[in-house]
Amino acid sequence: MLYLTLIRHAKSSWDNPSLDDFERPLNKRGLYTAPLVSQKLKIKLPSPDLILCSPAKRAMQTADFFKNNKTIFEIKQNIYFDGLDEILEIIRQINPSCSNVWLFGHEPNLSEMVEFFTGKILAKFPTCAVFQICFSVEKWSEIEKESGKISFSLIPKDFILQKP
């Protein structure tokens, strides 16, 4: 079994209109939500073997709350700059020794991945939400369209009652 956990970056700031989209940091709510989601995942899911992360500031800041010293951490330019096909290629090239992979990324690519892998259309993939997809294969190169199932999901608003 292989597990791909998709995590959208936490809420980002739009306070500085002159800031390039790539450089936008997390806002107050994002900095509040990301560690809470991270704590929840540490209870619910095993630690990943590999984290793949967009190089955008908000994705990197979010991933920082989830990283540990034992997990391989890789920044992949394609997660921010390219579309679904290029991200699928990254996933298919993952070493099979990494059976539990977390990917920190952006919309609409994350929703498109859920639909591609499971056939399920998400109405929304909220900030800092988590969707884990499991595949009954041994190699990442063997995953195909609609070959996975959602095995876990977490939406921050479902368990975080107070917002800063």
Where are these regions (language model features)?
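Non-DNA-binding regulatory cores of transcription-related proteins
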Residues: I94-S97, E107-C128
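Generic beta-sheet signal
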Residues: L4, P96-G105
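Short alpha-helix plus adjacent loop in nuclease-associated cores
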Residues: F81-I91
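Short, glycine/charged-enriched secondary-structure capping and boundary segments
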Residues: L19-F22, F65-N69, L88-I90, F116-K120, ...
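Domain-level recognition of soluble alpha/beta enzyme cores
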Residues: I121-S153
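Glycine-rich phosphate-binding loop signature in dinucleotide/nucleotide-binding domains
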Residues: K44-S47, Q93-S99
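Active-site-proximal alpha-helix that buttresses catalytic centers in soluble enzyme cores
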Residues: L2-Y3, I7-N78, D82, L110, ...
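Functional cleft and adjacent loop/helix regions within the main domain
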Residues: Y80-D82, E142, S147-P164
